[in-house]
Amino acid sequence: MAMAAAAAVASQGLLATSSQQQKKSSAKLICNAATFFSGKRLLWVKSCNNGAVGLRASGVRCEAQAIEREAVKADAGNSREEDAFSGLKQVCAVLGTQWGDEGKGKLVDILAQRFDVVARCQGGANAGHTIYNDKGEKFALHLVPSGILNEKTTCVVGNGVVIHLPGFFKEIDNLESKGVNTNGRLLVSDRAHLLFNLHQEVDGLREAELAGQMIGTTKRGIGPCYASKAIRNGIRVSDLRHLDTFREKLDILYRDAAARFKDFEYSSDEVNAEMEKYVKYAERLEPYIVDTVDYVNAAIAEGKRILIEGGQATMLDIDFGTYPFVTSSNPSVGGICTGLGVAPNRLGDIVGVAKAYTSRVGSGPYPTELFGEEGDELRKAGFEWGTTTGRPRRCGWLDIVALNFVCTINGFTAINLTKLDVLSGLPEVKLGIAYKTPSGEKLRAFPADLSILEQVEVEYEILEGWKEDITKVRSYDELPAAAQRYVERIEELIGLPCQYIGVGPGRDALIVKQ
C-alpha cells in the first residue's frame, strides 16, 4: 500500500523537477529520498535532486508539501532534531557496522536525553566510547553505558556483558569526581559474568602462543572470560552474594588456567589476596545489582523508552565477522536479545553507525585499507588511535560490500554516518562498491573464507571531494554539493537513509537529515 501511495504521488507530477524560478525560492531537498512508514519503514523512494518537495507519511498515506527555503531555515536546528528523534520507536538500538570505533557513543549520548533507560548488552572493557558533556569535558567509557551523562537516564549493564570490577569502579570514581551521580542510576545484571585479572593474564599468554598468527586482542581478558562462561566454570555477579562458595570457584579458575598454560603460575597467597579484594568488591557492588531481565522488560511494559547501546561492531561479531579476527560476543542485533533478555518482537528502530571511511585496530583482513602516506593522512585527520588500546588504527575507504552485508544481518532502519568532516580537503573520495577474485569473478556477497577475502580486488567508485570545512554545518542543505553527493551515493548503494551525519566530535556537531 505504501508503494501504491508513493506511485500515486509521483503520477500526479508532484516529484517533477523544479523550474529555475522554483529553485531560487525553494529549498533543495533535505534528502534525495523519502521514507514511508506503515508501522515499520517499508519503502525508500528516490526523488529528484533539485525539487522543492517534501514527503510526509502517516500510516500508508503520503502527502506532498512544498518546502520553501525560509521555512526550512526556520525549522532547522533543535525543532528539526526533535521531530527526527521523537519518531523513534519505544525500543531503539544503536549498533556498529564496521570494526568498532565508529562513534556510537556520541549518538547514544544525544539520544539518551529522549530515553528512560540506556542498556549495554554485550562485550566488556574492550569496547571504548568517547563522549563529551556540555562543558566539552571528555569521558572515555568502557563498561558504563554512554547515557550516564544524562541525569534522568537509568543505565543498565546487561547479562551479556563481562565485567572487570576494578575497571568498573575506576570509571564510576572518575565520573563522580566530575560531578556525575551514578547512585540509583547504574544497574548491573546479577547474571553478568565477572572478568578477573587472571583472564587478562591468560589473554596475553594466548596471544604469545599464537606468535605470528596473533588475533590482535586488546588483552583485556574478554575472550578468556567468555571461554570460562562457555565451559561453565565462570563466576557471575550473583556469586558475590555467596562468598562461602566463592573461594572454591575462584580456585577452579586458577587451576584451569595453570593446566592450560605452562607459563601461568600462581600461589595460594595470590588467590587469598584476590579473594580479599572481592569480599570488598561484593559490598561495594551490592547496591548496583538487580535482575536486569526483569527490570528492562518491566520498563517496556510500563511504556518507558529503552535505548540499547552495542559495543564494538558487526564486522567483529564472533559469527558474522572476519573470524578468527573477531571479538568473543555478538555485537549484532542477535546479541541484544541474548544479552538483555529482550524478545525480538520488542525491537523497534535499529540505527547502524558507520564512519564515512573505515578503520580497524589489530589484525585481520581489511579489503579497502590504505597504506603509506594516504593511510597516514587519514589517520591523522581522524585522530585514529584506539580508545581502549591507544594503538594506531588502520584506515581505508568506505567498504560498501561489507556495509551491505551488515545491513542485511541487522535490519537497520537508518544509518548514522560519522566523521564526514575528516574527508574534507581530499581532492577525491572513493567507495569500495564490489569485490572481485583474482580471476575477475565478481563476488555476490561478503565471503566467510578468509583466503578469498585476503585476495579480493576492490572495485572503487571515485567521487569528487570537497575543500570546505564542514565542522560548523548543522543543516544538510548547507553541506557542499560534493559532500551531499557522497552521502546520497552511499544511500543509493545500501538502500537506507543516512539520517544522522556527524561533522565533528562535539555533541552539537550532528546533522539530522529529514
Swiss-Prot record:
The transit peptide segment here is 1-56
**Top EC class of this enzyme:** ligase
Q: One GO cellular component from the entry?
A: chloroplast
Q: Which cofactor does it need?
A: Mg(2+)
Q: Which UniProt keywords apply?
A: Chloroplast, GTP-binding, Ligase, Magnesium, Metal-binding, Nucleotide-binding, Plastid, Purine biosynthesis, Transit peptide
The record lists IMP as bound by: D101, E102, G103, K104, N126, A127, G128, H129, T218, R232, Q312, T327, R391
Residues reported to bind GTP: 100-106, 128-130, 393, 419-421, 502-504
What residues bind Mg(2+), as annotated? D101, G128
The subcellular localization recorded is: Plastid, Chloroplast
Q: Which GO terms describe its molecular function?
A: adenylosuccinate synthase activity; GTP binding; magnesium ion binding
List residues binding substrate.
Answer: T387, T388, T389, G390, R391, P392, R393
Which InterPro entries does this UniProt record tie to the protein? Adenylosuccin_syn_GTP-bd, Adenylosuccin_syn_Lys_AS, Adenylosuccinate_synth_dom1, Adenylosuccinate_synth_dom2, Adenylosuccinate_synth_dom3, Adenylosuccinate_synthetase, P-loop_NTPase
Q: In which pathway does it act?
A: Purine metabolism; AMP biosynthesis via de novo pathway; AMP from IMP: step 1/2
Q: Which residues of this protein are catalytic? A: D101, H129
Q: How is the cofactor bound?
A: Binds 1 Mg(2+) ion per subunit.
Q: Which reaction does it catalyse?
A: IMP + L-aspartate + GTP = N(6)-(1,2-dicarboxyethyl)-AMP + GDP + phosphate + 2 H(+)
Q: Which is a Pfam family this sequence falls into? A: Adenylsucc_synt
Organism's domain of life? Eukaryota
The UniProt entry, under NCBIfam families, shows: PRK01117.1 (NF002223), purA (TIGR00184)
Q: Which family is it part of?
A: Belongs to the adenylosuccinate synthetase family.
Function field: Plays an important role in the de novo pathway and in the salvage pathway of purine nucleotide biosynthesis. Catalyzes the first committed step in the biosynthesis of AMP from IMP.
Q: How does it assemble?
A: Homodimer.
Q: Which HAMAP family match?
A: Adenylosucc_synth (MF_00011)
Q: What is this protein called?
A: Adenylosuccinate synthetase 2, chloroplastic
State the organism named in the record: Physcomitrium patens
